[in-house]
A protein has these predicted regions:
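Positively charged n-region of N-terminal signal peptides that target proteins for export
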Residues: 1-5
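Substrate-binding surface in catalytic domains of secreted glycosidases
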Residues: 33, 60-76, 148-288
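Stable alpha-helical elements in mature extracytoplasmic
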Residues: 45-48, 77-81, 108-111, 121, ...
Length: 363
C-alpha cells in the first residue's frame, strides 16, 4: 500500500515537474545526517549515521563589523563529538552556524546580515571557516541563517539585500573551501518570496550550484490542530510533498535534497508548551489523558490527543519508514533529523532513520 501511494501520488507528479528528466540517477549511498547540539545530553551513535552537523557556532559581529566566530557552549562537548570519528573513520562531521547569539561574551551586533553585506567580511569569514576545518579535521560547513530578509530572535536583517548577499556568501564559502569540504544550508520549505520591503528566504536557483546538500526543514510546517511534517496534507500550511515540489520546480537535483525529520511533537508555535520531544512522548504514553500513535492516512503521520482533542503531530518509526521508501523512490540524497538528544534512551528514531536509508527497497 505504501509503495502504491508513493509511486502513484508523488513520483508521477514530480516526474512531470523535473526539468532534467526524472530519476536518471538515483544514488545508492544515502545520507543520514544527525544534528547534535552543544546543549544536548547524549551523543549520536556513529555507526548509525553518515554525517553529524554540530550545532552551533555563532558569529561575533561588533557594531556591524565581523570579528570572528566561536562555538556555542563548552568546547568539551565539541571534542566529544569529534572523537566519534575514532569509532567510525567514514563519519563526516560538519559545523553548523546559527543566526542566534547565546554566548555570554557576545551580543547581536549585525550577524549574518551585516557580515554578508561586505565582500571583505565574507571572505574573512570563509577563510576562518577553512582554517577551523583544517584545525579540527572537520568535513564541512553548514549555514543555518533563518532566514535572510527576516528578523527572528532579535537578529539583524535587511530585506533589500539579504537574499542577494546570502548567495554571495555561499559563493565565497565554496571558493574558499574548494571541493574538499562539504557545504550545505538549512533550507526553508519554499523559494525566496517577495515582500513589501524586499525579499525573504534564499534564492534557491542562485545558491544550489555552490552547495552539496540542502537540509530541507520539512518540520514545523504547521501546528495543532494541523500536522507539522505530513507527507501530504490538505489542511496544513505546507507539507513534504509541496516542499520537495518547490525545489524540483527550480531544477534542484533530487540527490542534493535531504528530507527533514523532527524528533519531537509540535503542539504550537507559542505558549507554555510548544514542543514535546520523543523521549518525553515515551514517558507520557502511560498518562491516561494522552493518546499517542494515532494515524492519519492522508498525511501518513502519527498524532496525539490530549483529553480527546488533537494535541500535536510528530514522527515515529512507522512514519519514518514511509518517508524512507519515499526518499528512495524519488532518489533524494537522504534525510536529516533535528535533533539527536530528543530521541529516547533506546535511540528508537535514530535507528528508524538508519533503517529507512539503508533498507534495500528493490528486494
Amino acid at each position: 500500500m505504501i509503495k502504491n501511494f508513493v509511486l502513484s501520488t508523488f513520483v508521477v507528479v514530480l516526474t512531470a515537474l523535473c526539468p532534467f528528466g526524472a530519476f536518471a540517477s538515483q544514488p545508492q549511498n544515502k545520507i543520514c545526517r544527525a544534528y547534535c547540539t552543544y546543549y544536548g545530553d547524549k551523543l549520536p551513535d556513529p555507526n548509525i549515521v553518515t554525517h553529524i552537523n554540530y550545532a552551533f557556532a555563532e558569529l561575533y559581529v561588533v557594531d556591524g563589523v565581523y570579528k570572528t566566530f566561536k562555538l556555542q557552549g563548552n568546547e568539551s562537548r565539541f571534542r566529544q563529538v569529534m572523537a566519534l570519528k575514532k569509532q567510525n573513520p567514514n563519519l563526516k562531521i560538519c559545523l553548523a552556524f546559527t543566526h542566534t547569539v547565546s554566548n555570554s561574551d557576545n551580543r547581536q551586533g549585525g550577524g549574518f546580515s551585516k557580515m554578508s553585506a561586505s565582500p571583505e567580511m565574507r571572505k574573512q569569514f570563509a577563510a576562518d571557516c577553512l582554517a577551523f576545518c583544517k584545525k579540527w579535521n572537520l568535513d564541512g560547513i553548514d549555514i543555518d541563517w533563518e532566514f535572510p530578509g527576516l528578523s527572528w530572535s532579535g537578529h539583524a536583517s535587511d530585506p533589500k539585500t539579504d537574499t542577494k548577499n546570502y548567495t554571495l556568501l555561499m559563493k565565497d564559502l565554496r571558493e574558499a573551501l574548494g571541493n574538499d569540504y562539504i557545504l550545505s544550508f538549512a533550507g526553508y520549505v519554499m523559494d525566496m518570496q517577495s515582500t513589501d520591503s524586499g525579499k525573504k528566504y534564499v534564492d534557491i536557483q542562485a545558491v544550489v550550484p555552490y552547495v552539496d546538500y540542502i537540509n530541507i526543514m520539512t518540520y514545523d510546517m504547521d501546528a495543532a490542530p494541523h500536522f507539522q511534517s505530513a507527507i501530504i496534507s490538505s489542511t496544513s500550511y505546507y507539507d513534504c510533498m509541496s516542499a520537495i515540489r518547490s525545489y524540483a520546480k527550480l531544477g534542484v537535483p533530487f540527490e542534493k535534497m535531504l528530507l527533514g525529520i523532527p524528533f519531537y511533537l509540535r503542539h504550537s508555535h507559542d505558549g507554555l508548551t510548544t514542543v514535546v520531544d520523543y523521549k518525553q512522548i515515551v514517558k507520557l504514553k502511560s498518562n491516561p489523558n494522552f493518546e499517542f500513535d494515532l494515524w492519519d492516512e492522508e498525511a501518513r503521520t502519527p498524532y496525539a490527543k490530549y483529553k480527546g482533542k488533537f494535541y500535536g503531530s510528530y514522527d515515529n518509526p512507522r512514519s519514518i519508514a514511509v518517508k524512507g521508501e519515499w526518499i528512495h523512490s524519488l532518489g533524494l540524497g537522504g534525510l536529516l533529523y533535528w535533533e539527536n538528544s530528543e530521541d529516547d534512551a533506546d535511540m528508537t528514531l535514530a535507528k528508524a532513520c538508519w533503517e529507512a536509508i539503508t533498507k534495500n527497497y528493490d528486494e
